[in-house]
Design a protein with these regions (language model features):
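C-terminal output helix
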Residues: 110-123, 127, 131
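Acidic, metal-coordinating helix/loop segments flanking the phosphotransfer/catalytic sites
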Residues: 35-53
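Active-site residues of response regulator receiver
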Residues: 57, 85
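Alpha4 helix (beta4-alpha4-beta5 surface) of REC/receiver domains from two-component response regulators
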Residues: 67, 88-105, 113, 117
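CheY-like receiver
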Residues: 126-143
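Receiver (REC) domain active-site loop signature in two-component systems and cognate sites
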Residues: 60
C-alpha cells in the first residue's frame, strides 16, 4: 500500500452503522477506510491520516457534525466532508458558512449508490476497486 494513498474517514457514534459503512466502503473502494466512534478521537488523530474525504454523522454526543467539520477542517484543510443525518436537515450558506468544506448532506436512509456517487464526485482520486461498479451488488441498498 502506498503511503500517499488517500483514506476514507468515517465519524459516527453508532458503532453498528459505522461498521456497516466501513465494510461497504472497504468492499467497494480500493483505499483504506478509517472509522472513529467519537468525534474527539477523530480530531486527535486526523492530522496523521491522509484523508481523501470524511463522512460524519450530524447527531453525536460530544459535538454536532457541523462543529466537528469546523474543527476538523482546520486540522485537514482542503478535505471534503459529507454530513449524514437521521433527521431531515436543512442548512443554508449562512448557517454553514462559505468556508466550511461541507460538500453534501445525506438523510438516512439513503441509497448506497448515492453515497458512493458523492464520494467519487468530491474525492475523485479515490478509485473503485478494479472490476467494481457503484452499486454493483445492490444499487439501492440503504446505507
Amino acid at each position: 500500500m502506498s503511503t500517499n494513498q488517500k483514506t476514507i474517514v468515517i465519524v459516527d457514534d453508532e458503532k453498528a452503522y459505522a461498521d456497516f459503512l466501513t465494510a461497504m466502503l472497504t468492499e467497494t473502494f480500493g483505499c483504506p477506510v478509517r472509522t472513529f466512534h467519537r468525534a474527539t478521537d477523530a480530531l486527535a488523530e486526523l492530522a496523521g491520516v491522509n484523508a481523501g474525504i470524511v463522512i460524519t454523522d450530524y447527531h453525536m454526543p460530544q459535538m454536532t457534525g457541523l462543529v466537528f467539520i469546523q474543527r476538523a477542517s482546520k486540522i485537514a484543510p482542503g478535505v471534503p466532508f459529507v454530513l449524514v443525518t437521521g433527521n431531515s436537515f436543512h442548512c443554508d450558506d449562512h448557517a454553514v458558512g462559505p468556508d466550511l468544506p461541507l460538500r453534501a448532506i445525506l438523510t438516512k436512509p439513503f441509497s448506497w449508490r448515492k453515497l458512493a456517487d458523492e464520494i467519487l464526485r468530491h474525492a475523485p482520486d479515490l478509485a473503485l476497486k478494479p472490476g467494481r461498479a457503484v452499486g454493483m451488488a445492490s444499487p439501492d441498498t440503504p446505507a
